[in-house]
Swiss-Prot record:
This is Protein Mis18-beta. Pfam families: Yippee-Mis18 (PF03226). Keywords: Cell cycle, Cell division, Centromere, Chromosome, Metal-binding, Mitosis, Nucleus, Phosphoprotein, Zinc. The gene is OIP5. GO terms for cellular component: Cajal body; chromatin; chromocenter; chromosome, centromeric region; intracellular membrane-bounded organelle; nuclear speck; nucleoplasm; nucleus. It is found in: Nucleus; Chromosome; Chromosome, Centromere. The keyword Nucleus applies. GO terms for biological process: cell communication; cell division; CENP-A containing chromatin assembly; chromosome segregation.
C-alpha cells in the first residue's frame, strides 16, 4: 500500500491576534488582561494608542481613528467556497492576481489552510519549472491553492506567500455584510507607499503595546536584583 503524503499546518509569522497560526501567549496576570481589554475597546471605538486616547487625553477624538487597513470598507474575510471555513483576511492580503494567475496572494493564512508536505514541480502553464506545495482546506479537504518554494524571476516575489485560488473562495465584506465570489470581487491593490505607511503604523502600535506590557510586568514582578536578607 502506498504511503499517503504527510500534511502539516501552514507556517507563518506570529500575528497580533485571532486564530492565525503562531499566536501569542496569554497573559496570566489580571492587570495585563484588563489592559488588553481596554486596548481592544479603544480599537472598536475608533481610537488607538497613537491617538489622543493613547496619550491620556481627557476628551476622546472627534472622529474615528482606526488604522487605514482596518477601515470597514477595506476589510473582508476570505472563506472556502465549499464549507465556508475562514482561510484568510484582507489585512494580510498582498496582491490580487486573479486575472493573471487566478489566485489571491496572502502573507498569512489561518490554521484552516493545510500545506501538503511533498514538493511538486510544474511542467506546464504559469508554474512551469516552479517547485511548490499544494494548499488544502483543512475542513473539507479540497485544494485551495499553492505555496511557492522556488520559481522563475517573474514569480519570484510570490515565494513564501500563500496563493489561494480565487475560484475556490467566497468573500465576506464587513461593511456591506455581503458574500460574493472572490473571482468576481474587484480588489484594489494598495500602492507601495501606502503599504509602507501602514507598516510603520503597525510597528508603532506594537511598540506602544509592548511598552505597556513591560510596565505592567515591572509593577507586578518583584525586583530580582535586590539581594535577599
Amino acid at each position: 500500500m502506498a504511503a499517503q503524503p504527510l500534511r502539516h499546518r501552514s507556517r507563518c509569522a506570529t500575528p497580533p491576534r485571532g486564530d492565525f497560526c503562531g499566536g501569542t501567549e496569554r497573559a496570566i496576570d489580571q492587570a495585563s488582561f484588563t489592559t488588553s481589554m481596554e486596548w481592544d475597546t479603544q480599537v472598536v471605538k475608533g481610537s488607538s494608542p497613537l491617538g489622543p486616547a493613547g496619550l491620556g487625553a481627557e476628551e476622546p477624538a472627534a472622529g474615528p481613528q482606526l488604522p487605514s487597513w482596518l477601515q470597514p470598507e477595506r476589510c473582508a474575510v476570505f472563506q472556502c467556497a465549499q464549507c465556508h471555513a475562514v482561510l484568510a483576511d484582507s489585512v494580510h492580503l498582498a496582491w490580487d492576481l486573479s486575472r493573471s494567475l487566478g489566485a489571491v496572494v496572502f502573507s498569512r493564512v489561518t490554521n484552516n489552510v493545510v500545506l501538503e508536505a511533498p514538493f511538486l514541480v510544474g511542467i506546464e502553464g504559469s508554474l512551469k519549472g516552479s517547485t511548490y506545495n499544494l494548499l488544502f482546506c483543512g475542513s473539507c479537504g479540497i485544494p485551495v491553492g499553492f505555496h511557492l518554494y522556488s520559481t522563475h524571476a517573474a514569480l519570484a516575489a510570490l515565494r513564501g506567500h500563500f496563493c489561494l485560488s480565487s475560484d475556490k473562495m467566497v468573500c465576506y465584506l464587513l461593511k456591506t455584510k455581503a458574500i460574493v465570489n472572490a473571482s468576481e470581487m474587484d480588489i484594489q491593490n494598495v500602492p507601495l507607499s501606502e503599504k509602507i505607511a501602514e507598516l510603520k503604523e503597525k510597528i508603532v502600535l506594537t511598540h506602544n503595546r509592548l511598552k505597556s506590557l513591560m510596565k505592567i510586568l515591572s509593577e507586578v514582578t518583584p525586583d530580582q536584583s535586590k539581594p535577599e536578607n
